[in-house]
Structure formats: C-alpha cells, structure tokens
Amino acid sequence: MVRILLKKTGRGFVLKNSMTPHITQIKVNKSIEILKVPVSKHPKGYNDHIGFDVDERLIKKILIMRYQKVSITTIQSKNDLDKLVLRKPDLVFSGVKYFNFKKEKIWLNDFLKQNNISHITSSAKDLQSESNKSIAKDIIRKAKIITANSLVVYANKMPKSFALPMPFPVFVKPLIGGNSKGVDEHSVVTNSTELKKKIKDIQKKYNCASIVETYLRGKEYTVGIMQDTVTGNLIALPAEIIIEKNKQGQRILDFKMKKENTEELIKVSDIKLFNVLADMAKKSFTALKGRSIGRIDIRMNENFIPHFIEANLMPGLRGGYFYRCCNLNLNINYQEMILRIVNNGLTLSKI
C-alpha cells in the first residue's frame, strides 16, 4: 500500500512532502463522496447537527490512493441531496448528523440508507439517544450496565428548594453536547447555591437543561470501538486519560483542557482492567445500537468500580481520542485508520 506521510498538528494532520517514488497501484472500483461540513452561523454555540468535522482535502488524498473515484461535495439544499442520490456513490463519508432545509429535518444516514447508499456511522434514532445524556444513561441502566445516579434539571423549572436523589458533591454538565463543552472548574458542586448557579450558567450559555449526577472520584478512561469488517464483531480500544489536578485538587476533563490538548492518553497495560473496560464499552455500544465506530467514556468511583459516563457514536476523526485509541491499541497510523473506517462502511452494509 502506498503511504501518505502525515505530520501531527494541534487539530489533526497535514501532508508532508515525500520522496517516495510513484508506485502504480490497482484501485478499488468504488466511488466515495466526502461531504463538506456546513459552516456554522453560530460558531460559539453547540452545533447539534454536526457529529464531527474533518479535513476533507486530506481525507480525499488518503482515499484516492485506494479508490477509483473520490470527490468532495457541499450540501446546501435538499436538491443537492437529491442530486447526490442520482450519482449513486458507493459510500458517503460525513460527520453530519442531519440537515435543516426550510424547516424540514433530514437525518443524513437514514436518508442514505433509504437510498441504498453506504455510510460510516449510526442511524438517526441511535444518534439522538446518544446525544441526550439522560436517554443514553436510561438505555445503559436497562442493559444492566453501571452508571452514576442522575437527574435532569431545567433552569426555568427549578424550584427554590429541591432534594437531590444523591448526596453532594455532584457533577453538573449540559444535557446535550460533547467535547466537554460546559464542563469547567465549577462543574463539581458541593451545595445548593453552587448547583443553582451552575445550572443557570449552562442554560444561559448552551440553552439546554443540565444533567446532575453522582460525582465519581476515580480515574477516567475512553474506549474506542471499531467493528470487524468481516464478522461485524466489536474491537475495543481502551486508553487511560491522564488529567492534571485543577485548583480545587480535582481531576476534571474540562473543555479548556480538551481545547488546549493538555491531557494525555496512555495504553491500559493491566490485562484484567483492559478486559473490564473492553467488556463494559462493547456492551454499552451494543445497547446504544452503535454502528461501525464509536467511543465510550468510563470513570471509576472511589471503590474502583467502573461507571459508564457517556457515549459518542460519531467520534471525532482528526487527531483526537478515537485516533489515539486506535494508534495505542492497533499500532496503526491515521491513514490506516481512515481506510479501515471506509472499508467498514462499505462492508457492514452487507452484514
């Protein structure tokens, strides 16, 4: 296989010049369209319609080495989607969850499936369940997987005094959204005054309710999930997240830390722990009806019991956690990861 040399940057990868001579390669007779992520009109807000963005040009340069026809497509209207269907690509590579066209909401992966076009991630119903942290936790509980006690609180419906079903301290974060948005040094609250303040802050900044849950004091892990293209079986890729203590002495994976990329991921070397994390992650992914790829976050309590935190069925495909899980556990580079994901998309539709 011809390799593209890549250089790691803050947000992902860029191409490096290579002196490798050109090698003639027989390409796979498949057509792939990479959808360009729509530019947000509200860059500071949470874009629920987007699961992840990618460097479309880099993805194209990787895929064109293996597949005969690879193109980048911008979707701005329902008519653009209809034209895509007429072109009938074998696979659409996209991090878009849904489009809003004149008040018509179209979930991309379901639309593609209805038109017999392969895609790389999960269905509309499952993405909706995953993005709402409370719904996801309810599904996890029904599957008899351990997760922290929690409740949803709306700032505009919050009574002057109410009793929590769990003792302080508690952890507070937005009900929807990923990438630790809304998580900061004030997310661990120890009394009712702090709780109300944090809930109101989340409502003001993200226009959504808060999920309040038991604070877990132990280590945090993330587990990448990739399906085997031949059998459909799940491969779990655990990694421990090394987090520095904040001013309060807590190890909180907050938005600022993720944005500045100051946390570290390391391989889980303890076999027993590896298997426990892998088992919980695979069961969680299955319960949430994930497809092809995903990421499950797990945190220990003070008794070293693992708890499901949340799931991401459309994990970022730049240089983030999912890639690092693949690199640590499978010893593959970014190019190989992208090719596996595409092969998954083309193959899993037949399983």
Model-derived regions, located:
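Conserved strand-to-helix beginnings and helix N-cap segments that scaffold or border functional pockets
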Residues: 105-106, 133, 320-323
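Phosphate-binding site of ATP-dependent enzymes
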Residues: 192-273, 279, 300, 305-307
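A short, flexible beta-alpha/helix-coil linker loop
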Residues: 39-43, 177-179, 262
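ATP-binding N-terminal substructure of ATP-dependent carboxylate-amine bond-forming enzymes
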Residues: 1-119, 125, 135, 154-162, ...
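Short acidic, glycine/proline-rich loop/turn micro-motifs
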Residues: 43-47, 182-184, 321-324
